Amino acid sequence: MTNYDVIEAYAEDFTKWAYRNSRGTVKITNNTIVITNVVETNNIIEDDKEPYSDLTIRVTGVTENKYLIVRQGRGKPEAYIKKDGVYTFKDNNLYFGFGVSVIGECNITITQLPTSILKDFSGNKHDAYLYGFKGKLNSGVGIYAQDFKNWSYGSTINNDISTKSYNKFHIVKKKADNWFGFTIGIPKNNYYNQSYKLKFNINKKIDDINFSIVSTDGNLITTAAYSVYINDGSIIDVPIISEEIFNNKEETNIYYDLGTNKDIEIDVELIADYPNQLCYDGKSYAVAYGLPILTDYTVIADRTWFAEKVDNGVFMSKALEQNGAFILEYKQGDKWNTYSYYSATNINIDKDNSIVYQTKNKYNEQTIYPGDKQDTDTLFIGTIRKDDSRSFNGCHGDILIFNRTLTEYELSWVKNNMMCSKQQEPDIDL
């Protein structure tokens, strides 16, 4: 999974579909269709222009007697949706659209689900749909200290050949014998002053060259903030720039300065913290629909909280209204709770261990007390539920959910053999 994959995106824009208002009444947004009245059972809204995308939708408000009709042209059979749930339609064509089986008032909602997903590798097809991820900085795969797309090349760099992405520059000079000098930079108000790692690749064998980070007005006033010698394959730790230098108001920009005039091309790559983990910025979350209703469970996750950024937040949950098998880790100020069948227990968080598990009666080794509420079929990651401000700021790797309480041996085995980022340790053999 890449940062491109997690950016919230949709296959279709419903506002561009043909609305046949003589056939019924529909409220339309980019991603939702709400049918409130039916005059005739033909398509009330349909796609009459190419391309005809594969589409995954969530439908609510249907019954056995008042159901959604999905129909299209070119000989494809109609589909009838009589149960709320998630449905996928592939290889669609002209006039793909929606009608209702019964004339009169109704309240059927068709919600297009994003193409950005967190894949379920269990084979159960319970993919989680990703909302609000930006694919950069602290909202996507790994955490990146800077967004290189916002940086600008200096006057000696060939903009037509050089390239940049959110995490990498490929730098080529205009003239072979030019000094690189102020190679690439950004205004201080867009520079995130924190520590990070850079990796350098150089296309020719050369002696070590000096790499500096400077605070500058871009002309005459310059202060060196950091300097180190680099070569092909070098990885460096860029420190936080001192407040005295960073707050100098005359020097409004930060630049990378490469002290060489060699005829070379240089790649500068920003190395992510928490690589291969999905990172949440408090505004992003994931939702999986149609999960089994659990009467017992074990959930195991490899997660890291950035707890200092969260006052009131939840890692993951199956809560809808006052039901749900678990709310795993609910932070309220300095207090931590966890919920089992909607009964709360105060817990202690082990901040040095990213692997956490919860069963019906235990959070890690701590006893918790389950309530008597029912489970739901929806899983939320990064929030307690959709459209709720109690969110997660942090990262996670593997998440595993079982439909029973695992034994100590099974828990140990799962941590060692199924949690990809967990260092091996002896299985507990009882």
Enumerate the predicted regions with their spans.
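Extracellular/lumenal carbohydrate-interaction signature centered on repeated Trp-anchored short motifs
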Residues: I44-L55, I184-Y196, Y289-I300, I347-D352, ...
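Solvent-exposed strand-to-loop "edge" motifs in beta-rich extracellular domains
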Residues: R58-T63, K199-K205, D302-K309, S317, ...
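Extracellular beta-strand ligand-recognition surfaces/modules
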Residues: T88-N107, D237-K262, K360, D375-K386
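Carbohydrate-binding surfaces in secreted/extracellular proteins
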Residues: N348-K373
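Extracellular glycan-interaction patches encoded by glycine-rich segments
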Residues: T367-G397
